[in-house]
Amino acid sequence: SRREIDLRWPLIAFLLAASLASVLGLINHFGVDLFGFYQNLRAADLGRFLSTLGNADFYGSYLVLAFPVALNAIIHADGRRSFMLSAAAMVCVFFGALVAGSDSAALGLLATAVVFPLVLFNDASAMRRLALGWGVFFLTAFVFGLLSAVLPSKTYLSFFTVAVSRAVVSLPLAATAVALWFLLGRAG
């Protein structure tokens, strides 16, 4: 007999790992070294080391994989609990992606922005949640910009992160995404 494979548990495990790596990357960016990883690093490596993954490029590549998975989890969440847990994982991964300091991570995020609408175009509910997800991303970028103004930065940031975390960029983009979310709700 054929069994259908339940991929929820691997998805949950991946999102949990990505969320933890992202939160650790975020607090590392602001100068908190929970596990003493920075003690034996050379001065030249201090600005490029993030989370348990080490190199910022590897960390950024990992989060480029986690970013669409987190968006997909919230798009397909069924029930309030699943939606809230997916949203929490998504916000963690968004913060982690912002501190990656890798231009390749930024390109991966832009690829997600292009590919997801093409795949989801025929599903109005999924498109609506995608718009909400991008709205949350830009609000996360805005909050990151606020935090960056008052907390010390210990790692490098990509040009993309510096630009998108400015209020003049993040707030209009968040408002546009939320407006699209409302419009898609009225159309559906």
Where in this protein do the model-derived segments appear?
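Alpha-helical transmembrane segments of multi-pass inner-membrane proteins
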Residues: 1, 5-188
